[in-house]
Amino acid sequence: MPTRKSNTYLSLVNSYLIDSPQPSSINYWWNLGSLLGLCLVIQIASGVFLAMHYSSNIELAFDSVEHIMRDVNAGWLIRYIHANGASFFFICMYLHIGKALYYGSYKQPRVMLWVIGVVIFILTMAIAFMGYCLVYGQMSHWGATVITNLLSAIPFIGNDIVPFIWGGFSVSNPTIQRFFALHFLLPFILAALVCMHLMALHVHGSSNPVGITGNIDRLPMHPYFIFKDLITVFVFLLIFSLFVFYSPNTLGHPDNYIPGNPMVTPPSIVPEWYLLPFYAILRSIPDKLGGVIAMFGAILILLSLPYTDRSIIRGNSFKVLSKLAFYLFVFNFILLGNLGQLHVEVPYIQLGQFATAYYFAHYIIVVPVISTLENILYYIGTQTRVK
């Protein structure tokens, strides 16, 4: 028996990365998992180096970032890798979720895999928000103020929670210091959740585009899918490098190059682009508590999909109506992202409310109705064929 199978530790690596049997039909959308793993490694590595030079004191936070940019050897590179790495992390994550929605990866027997994935998504957004606050530019300060203030909408205890999180009566030194401590700690918890995600995946294996069991035809992970993953890794690194070296501030906000000033409010307060769809949902509800519930509900409603999708066939590869509904949902989500960065004025308010209503309707009405209708059509088709 080879050492990779007999050794206790190497056998674990072997079962995940070498001999792991994968369905032969999986396409390039299945490469996003390895890209997300790469993003996490890049973020943790660059973050550790940034933490060596960053000061979490509110008086020094902005200046310490400028010190990293100007005085630390290759500090500009580490900072831009970390800042753009966050954006690329979310690009890959949204594509990964989109793949799961399209191919029905959330259906039985992979519900636990899906639940852990949603928890990872929520934790990643929390980590990204706290990291954005640490720069302590104008948008960091006001973004932190607005988002943390949302907790004041919680009945009875909300007004006590907000100063508890701030450590004072506004976003101040204790806020930035505790955000820094959590921003450093939580990625390691995220890495543990990723390991749990892989363990849950390992129980039943990957799904596939066809939507049937992959046991009919499987191939070992190495060398076939390792080399297939390497193709997208190199493409990812090429595009990532283009942003880091040639357009590092495109995905950021120019106001964050102005030191945070509690006395000057920016014309519009917007979070980073990857949080904009949920920010648009928050703003589209006039009531504060209703907006907060809608925003968190928009994320947690992902957990309902294994139960609201009644289809007997996994995935949308052979389902015309489900494909149409999926592409409408994607368009609506992109529309919400655009609305989140626009001023709250006449055409955008109503448009945001319609987009929010459709977002929830997709999960609650569209998916159950279309999946049931397609089941009926499938049954009629099979009965006709039998006759």
UniProtKB/Swiss-Prot annotation:
Keywords: Electron transport, Heme, Iron, Membrane, Metal-binding, Mitochondrion, Mitochondrion inner membrane, Respiratory chain, Transmembrane, Transmembrane helix, Transport. Heme b b566 binds at H96, H197. GO terms for molecular function: metal ion binding; ubiquinol-cytochrome-c reductase activity. This is Cytochrome b. One of its GO terms (cellular component) is mitochondrial inner membrane. It is a multi-pass membrane protein. Heme 1 (or BL or b562) is low-potential and absorbs at about 562 nm, and heme 2 (or BH or b566) is high-potential and absorbs at about 566 nm. Binds 2 heme b groups non-covalently.
